[in-house]
Design a protein with these regions (language model features):
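Conserved donor sugar-nucleotide recognition element shared by glycan-biosynthetic enzymes
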Residues: 49-52, 56, 107, 136, ...
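N-terminal glycine/serine-rich phosphate-binding loop of ATP-dependent small-molecule kinases
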Residues: 1-97, 125, 153, 208-209
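Active-site metal-coordination/substrate-binding segment of hydrolases
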Residues: 110
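Gly/Ser/Thr-rich active-site cleft segment
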Residues: 11-13, 123-222
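Conserved H-loop
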Residues: 70, 120, 203
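Hydrophobic or amphipathic alpha-helical targeting/insertion segments
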Residues: 91-95, 113, 117, 122
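Carbohydrate-associated surface elements
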Residues: 104
């Protein structure tokens, strides 16, 4: 059977969008799946990654049915999504806690402290971004200071797109475009910066392998 279709997944803030295209780029079918943002305290904004996954699975099924497309004819899947989450998973792939998302500001004090201790200019020279609570860096450190039981069980920290890719393939990676959410990502080399990891206090073991955005990272597990 020929593989004539491409499937795209976008993890938005309020919903996922899924579409199937033919090889000429024509949209054959599309669907969405909604999920909430939770605001448990002032300045907090978090989501449940497992709800993203459920919404994606539902939207994919809707697309395939709507377009009358056999799953075997999907040649490839591309995934993008909201940036700057901090999805903590354990070695079994279980999500350890709700993830703060890009609009969350709970880690402002951590950012202020590190900008003083390390130097905001020094951080910027490596990462190309100022250290702010919206980024992933501060969220990881917030886990360490406020959720030690979560922190000690972290295997990897993922972003929205790498989390969905992991659920689809079982492969833990992070595409290059999302690396900038961590200030230990060296914008000049495109790699994790060991010295900045040490300064920030982020274990390199938490960080997935960085891969190009167009690299095939695996195949669907079922």
């Amino acid at each position: 059977m020929s593989k004539n279709y491409l499937l795209g997944i976008d993890i938005g803030t309020s919903a996922c969008k899924v579409a199937v295209f033919d090889r000429e780029g024509k949209v054959i079918a599309s669907a969405t799946g909604d999920y909430p943002v939770y605001y448990p305290q002032e300045g907090w904004a978090q989501q449940k990654p497992d709800e993203w996954w459920s919404a994606v699975c539902s939207a994919v099924r809707k697309c395939l049915v709507k377009g009358d497309i056999p799953p075997e004819e999907i040649a490839g899947v591309g995934i993008d999504g909201q940036s700057w989450s901090a999805i903590a998973i354990d070695k079994e792939g279980k999500v350890l806690t709700d993830t703060p998302i890009w609009m969350d500001t709970r880690a402002q004090e951590i950012c202020d402290r590190l900008n003083q201790e390390i130097g905001s200019d020094n951080i910027f020279q490596v990462a190309g971004n100022s250290l702010q609570p919206s980024y992933t860096t501060a969220k990881i450190l917030w886990y360490r200071e406020n959720q030690p039981e979560v922190y000690k069980n972290i295997y990897k920290i993922l972003q929205s797109n790498s989390f969905i890719a992991y659920r689809l393939t079982g492969t833990v990676t992070q595409d290059l475009s999302q690396g900038y959410g961590l200030h230990c990502f060296n914008m000049h080399t495109g790699k994790w910066d060991e010295k900045m990891c040490e300064k920030l206090g982020i274990p390199m073991d938490f960080l997935p392998d960085i891969v190009p955005c167009d690299q095939v990272v695996g195949t669907v597990t079922r």
